Structures are given as C-alpha cells and as structure tokens.
Amino acid sequence: MSATQNYGTGRRKTATARVFLRPGTGNISINNRSLDNFFGRETARMVVRQPLELTETVEKFDIYVTVIGGGVSGQAGAIRHGITRALMQYDETLRGALRKAGFVTRDAREVERKKVGLRKARKRPQYSKR
C-alpha cells in the first residue's frame, strides 16, 4: 500500500466499513456517493464527521469509504470507527484526543438473540395465574 493513503477498518453492530484517507480537500465518498446523498439523517452525517472535527483535519483529507451490512446508525458508527483508525495510522499523536472522546473503542454492544419460548430476546408471554 502506498504511503499517500491511510487505511482503517471500522465496525459497529453488523456494519463494516473500509476507510481510505488520501490528501485532499475534504470530500467524503461513501459507496461512490457523497456523504449528504448517502445519509439522509443529519445525525448520521454529524457522527461521521466527529473524528475529523475533533482533530481539525476536515479540509485535509479526501475520504473514500466502502460500507456493508447494518442500518443507518450502525453504518455511521462503523465509518466513524474506521476514520478514527485511519487517522491514528496517519498520526499516532492524535490517539490521546480520539481515545478521550471515545472514538477508538469498538462499541461491543450487539443485538441479543431471541430465545425459544419467549416473544423476543427477553419479553415473556403474559403469565396467567389461573
């Protein structure tokens, strides 16, 4: 891999994002679509930009992302995690600030499986005493 780009893999819930940072002007491309086009929700766009705004590198990189699996929230979280890892590969001194903001840690919360005899993972059928 060339030294002109940095790579990071991000995961959240069932979503996986492959993130490439290249020197540029701040364009963010997700699955060959713009950030605004890919995410309809403003909160998802904000989540994706968080590590860049924290490290003040918004205008410094062009970001190319391939993301698969999950929903809107999971994909946004996976992209944020991938951008964070790529930024740390670019400059290790950013790790402290990113760690303090909580972007470095992989959010390990997953959907709990449905159990036999229950309606959902924990919801039980109504109990009848008589």
Curated annotation (Swiss-Prot):
Q: Does the keyword Transcription regulation apply?
A: no
One of the GO biological process terms: translation
Keywords attached to this entry: Ribonucleoprotein, Ribosomal protein
Single annotated GO MF: RNA binding
Show the disulfide pairing: none
**Record's GO cellular component, any one?**
cytosolic small ribosomal subunit
Q: Which family does it belong to?
A: Belongs to the universal ribosomal protein uS9 family.
PANTHER family named in the record: RIBOSOMAL PROTEIN S9, SMALL RIBOSOMAL SUBUNIT PROTEIN US9M
This one is known as Small ribosomal subunit protein uS9
User: What is the species of this protein?
Assistant: Pseudomonas syringae pv. tomato (strain ATCC BAA-871 / DC3000)
Instruction: Identify the gene encoding this protein.
Output: rpsI
